[in-house]
Amino acid sequence: MRIGTSLINPARPDDVVAAAADAARRGLDSFWTNQNPGRWDPLVLLATLGERPPETGTAILTTYPRHPVTTATEALTVQAATGGGLTLGVGPSHAWYIQDQLGIPYTSPLRHTREYLTVLRPLLNGEHVRHSGEFFTVDTKLDVTAPPPALLMAALGPRMLELARELTDGVVTTWVTPELIAEHVAPRVGTDIRIVVQVITLLSTEPDRAREALARDFGAVGEMPAYRASLGRAGLSSPADTVVIGDETDIVNALTRFRDAGTTDVVLSPLGTPADRKRTLDLIDTFSS
């Protein structure tokens, strides 16, 4: 199992640059950025990195606000500018962002994502795309010379997981447990594509109290239909129930369970102070040994 890390809600681009350099010095396999509403652009951030792990990725880049031609152009530009190593993770996000904040109709995320990938993938591969569909009409070829990035897709529900297996190199998941990976995700995507799991952690000597606080902090996340359905499959009531809370041993044990469940890549996302993040990432040597 490959291990990488991400930085949750960085305050400044410099924080991302420093975190990626730290990940590289630690020998981690990957570093990931995320598109959060009103925050930094993940692809631009990756293009600014100096020292970095072998793989950098977006987990995820939102599809609805970006035309697939734009996404392909930006991704290939990052590949060319940085010497490769990009993994492009995309996904439809959620209605509260796409429709409520941006005013874009959140119509059939499954059909939209299928069509998006149908246009995006061949563009990344340097092909001329001629497509006329429900959401996009495209007749173009990109004059951008760069190796195609690996293509991942955010997926939790059964049909989205099956779509990821059909059209991408892997899935990106978050707010999941090892049991959800073993019983729901892995059986639907098989063993031929990657299963990338963002594992959110928190070092705490009072895990029950910490989980109660996180349940309040992440309450709105649990109301999003995709996450609510996924949590329901596992019999969980809150995204906080998926956070690994405890000491170093608890985190190492959780990583072992994710590996045994079929996870190919873990993206560690530590909560807490900078010192907590350092302690968490220091565990990688323990786990690897």
Language-model segments: residues:
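Active-site-adjacent structural elements that line small-molecule/cofactor binding pockets in enzymes
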Residues: 1-289
